[in-house]
Amino acid sequence: MYFLSAEERKQLFGGLLPRARSEPVSEELRGWSWHQPPLQPIYDLKLSLFEVANRYCRTGRDLYLRRVLGVETSPNLPMIQGAIFHKTVAKVITTAKRLIYQVGIDDFPEAKRRLSEPDYLSIESFRDRLSQEQIEEIKEKVRVLWEFESTRICSRAEELLASQPRLNEDSLVFHSIPVVVEQKLDGAFLGLSSHLSVDAFTFATPVIFDLKFDVKRDFHRLSPTGYALVMEAMYEFPVDIGCTVYACFKGNRILLERDFYLIDNELRQNFVEERDEKMRMIYEELDPGRPEECYATCPYIQSCKGE
């Protein structure tokens, strides 16, 4: 999911990185300026990053129902599938790293063999919420996803092993799997949860990756923007590039589209405004009202309509 093609690397190094240098972000909108406006939180609240960046409900009434009225709901099928697929991608990447360290480069074929076996444990925590038919369908998609990702990892590793005779395990992991998945972040400086988790991040060229099993939405760029601000607040180095990875299944195939962009002043300002508006709604208990049109998979739709 996070391994770039030659064309994408060219776009990144020849386009976005030079633009990031020539179009600098305002200091006041860097995460390390969390202690002063406009980044300084205006209310003593903590929001999850999803609560800030989510605009599926155009008025944000889902957040009002959850945080002000205390309405509880269960995850629906698209939410469950998304959670399972995210866990699967993270699992195959961490498993590949672990196997390289455990088995070593001299017996890489054994690591490759063991990595070829899909891990279905991510389904177990949702088993009581799914029918047998749904379980089998999701299991097949997990298999396709696991095989897609593990094959790409092994190909990258074998290419490196063939060209670098003095490679060690640590170097192989770094160069063939150059991402950190589910990195834990503390967003407290910015009025966000202390238990954030970013889908993937690359340190060599700081890029925030956000994986979506969804169609493109105009607000999807807000999530990497929020993570970039948090990382800047924690580590005090600039994070200027985001990438939303759109994945979908077509039979036994995975289709991918990666949307790269600068995390510029406009995106940062939009994120801060969204955070402040939602904090105010919760703090002052302001009902934003129902949207003109509800999205089909909203888990709060019955409570929202009073049914």
Regions of interest found by a model, annotated:
Residues 101, 105, 111-112, 116-124, ...:
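A broadly structural signal marking compact, well-ordered functional cores
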Residues 59, 85-86, 181, 196-215, ...:
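Conserved catalytic cores of phosphodiester-cleaving nucleases, focusing on short active-site segments
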Residues 80, 219-222:
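A generic structural signal for residues located within well-ordered alpha-helices
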Residues 135-138, 214-218, 238:
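Short, surface-exposed loop and linker segments with low hydrophobicity and enrichment for Pro/Ser/Thr
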Residues 222-233:
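An active-site-proximal "capping" alpha-helix that borders the catalytic cofactor pocket
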Residues 1, 175-194, 233-307:
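Metal-dependent nuclease catalytic regions and adjoining charged, substrate-binding loops involved
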Residues 202-215, 220, 234, 257-266:
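Structural signature of nuclease core domains in nucleic-acid processing machines
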Residues 1-197:
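Metal-dependent nuclease catalytic cores that hydrolyze phosphodiester bonds in DNA/RNA
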